[in-house]
């Protein structure tokens, strides 16, 4: 049985309906609660049940982001970022940095069901301190991509295999201003992706081999955490 609690929202799941109902009864006898039945919407995430699994999406939340940014009717883009990021563009300051940060912060929450925008959101996050007009143009491109993929999300398949797998990669000195590298990884439980990240490395690597080892170390740490968090699961789990 698993219990997810956020402020006054509770999500319960488990393999025994008897235990779930018992816990709900015990909680209800102590606290004022309302049982909403099978989950359909939780913390901005829409959950649709299918015979073969669950589909998680944030379509309504994405629409809200676009509306707040004044880009609900914008022209969609097929990719979140250009092929090459140009660091030598105009450095004119964006007049409303708080607006820039608000949009980027909202996009960070959208990555909960959208691993495809993790890298792009990481790039614009790095420019929140003193955003320029060019940075805002880059942010608008991410929003245009969200517009064109607004119904995308995560499909969680039913799967009896609980082996953990991970994939990682990194560039080398991809950030032209700091010469720091970026690591990306994703981990899977069976055939389902369960965690992902795109993050600039904290220090400069002196070779591509060094940056790859840093990426591997970060991924290994994620695997260790994932395995530890499931240590109480009775099912056998292999780590590859």
UniProtKB/Swiss-Prot annotation:
| Superkingdom of the organism of origin | Eukaryota
Subcellular location, principal: mitochondrion
Q: Which GO terms describe its cellular component?
A: mitochondrion
| Tagged with keyword Kinase | no
Compartments where found: Mitochondrion
Pfam families linked to this entry: RVT_2
Keywords in alphabetical order, please.
Mitochondrion
Which CDD domains does the entry mention? Answer: RNase_HI_RT_Ty1 (cd09272)
Q: Which InterPro entries match?
A: DNA/RNA_pol_sf, RVT_2
- Any further remarks? A stretch of 270 kb of the mitochondrial genome is duplicated within the centromere of chromosome 2 resulting in the duplication of the gene. The expression of this duplicated gene (At2g07683) is not demonstrated.
What is the protein named?
Answer: Uncharacterized mitochondrial protein AtMg00810
């Amino acid at each position: 049985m698993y219990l997810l609690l956020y402020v006054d929202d509770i999500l319960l799941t488990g393999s025994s309906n008897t235990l779930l109902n018992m816990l709900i009864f015990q909680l209800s006898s102590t606290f004022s609660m309302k049982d909403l039945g099978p989950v359909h919407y939780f913390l901005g995430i829409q959950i649709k049940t299918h015979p073969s699994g669950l589909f998680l999406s944030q379509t309504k939340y994405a629409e809200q982001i676009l509306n707040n940014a004044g880009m609900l009717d914008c022209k969609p883009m097929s990719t979140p970022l250009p092929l090459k990021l140009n660091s030598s563009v105009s450095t004119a300051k964006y007049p409303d940095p708080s607006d820039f940060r608000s949009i980027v912060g909202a996009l960070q929450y959208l990555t909960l069901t959208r691993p495809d925008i993790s890298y792009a959101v990481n790039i614009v996050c790095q420019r929140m301190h003193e955003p320029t007009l060019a940075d805002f143009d880059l942010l608008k491109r991410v929003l245009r991509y969200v517009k064109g993929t607004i119904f995308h999300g995560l499909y969680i398949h039913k799967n009896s295999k609980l082996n953990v797998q991970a994939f990682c990669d990194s560039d080398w000195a991809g950030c032209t201003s700091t010469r720091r590298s970026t690591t990306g990884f994703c981990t899977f439980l069976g055939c389902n992706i369960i965690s992902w990240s795109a993050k600039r490395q904290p220090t400069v690597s002196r070779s591509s081999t060094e940056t790859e080892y840093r990426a591997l170390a970060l991924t290994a740490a994620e695997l260790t955490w994932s395995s530890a968090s499931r240590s109480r699961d009775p099912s056998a789990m292999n780590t590859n």
